[in-house]
Amino acid sequence: MAKEKIRIRLKAYDHRILDQSAEKIVETAKRSGATVSGPIPLPTEKTVYTILRAVHKYKDSREQFEMRTHKRLIDIVSPTPQTVDSLMRLDLPSGVDIEIKL
């Protein structure tokens, strides 16, 4: 597995859970002897939903809600088989979406 790179992309609505998960991944990879670059914060995606407050009329009265999706990127350079095995066994919170590319 020499000169390979694992790219891990994390997404979550809560940035605290996201940072805790990123630290767990970095700590696990460093313990197994791999070189880690990150966590790199990526731009936060903000989605705004505008709805009418009233049911039938009063179009001027609206309410806005937003959803923020926080993202982090972690690169693991030259991972060992032990690194891959320990990352597979890692237990992360359910609010974090993980994409792994080899």
Swiss-Prot record:
GO cellular component: ribonucleoprotein complex; ribosome
Alphabetical UniProt keywords: Ribonucleoprotein, Ribosomal protein
UniProt keyword Ribonucleoprotein, yes or no: yes
Entries under InterPro entries matching the protein: Ribosomal_uS10, Ribosomal_uS10_CS, Ribosomal_uS10_dom, Ribosomal_uS10_dom_sf
GO molecular function: structural constituent of ribosome; tRNA binding
BP GO annotations: translation
Keyword Ribosomal protein among record annotations: yes
Domain of life of the source: Bacteria
Disulphide linkage map: none
Assembly and binders: Part of the 30S ribosomal subunit.
Function noted in UniProt: Involved in the binding of tRNA to the ribosomes.
Protein name stated in the entry: Small ribosomal subunit protein uS10
Organism encoding this protein: Bacillus thuringiensis (strain Al Hakam)
Protein encoded by which gene: rpsJ
